[in-house]
Amino acid sequence: MSTAEAPAIGGQLATFWLDGDLYGVEVAHVQEVLKSQGLTRVPLAPAAVAGLINLRGQVVTAIELRERLGRPSRPEGTDAVVIVVRLHGEAVSLLVDAIADVVDVDPADFEAPPDTLAGQARDLIRGAFKLDGQLLLALDVHKAVSP
């Protein structure tokens, strides 16, 4: 994938940790961040659908990003952090390991996803930024929540 195929992103990204790697989503999509929430499992749902959460009376689908990105399951007894994103007027939650910071990124620093990304992850990453010696992977939130 080149930057010609995926438009560069810039501005503010809400960053989070997942399996030791730093990811980010555009702040414009983030509604709120919550501590671990009780999940109601959904029978016969795709593996990436961790369940449903009750967000002040609104039922919201919870997507397990570890599953979507082909990462190992969250260690037993470890709670996820919930990032609620709003897309096309609908709320969806993303389960991550830990929330990091909101960072400003320059579209000129946008790079194509690393060649080392494979499988499911390659399709969900828009690109990368080098941030203080750390690689920040920009998640395509629309693809991440799509079946």
Which positions does each model-derived feature cover?
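An acidic, low-aromatic, low-complexity terminal/linker signal
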Residues: 1-147
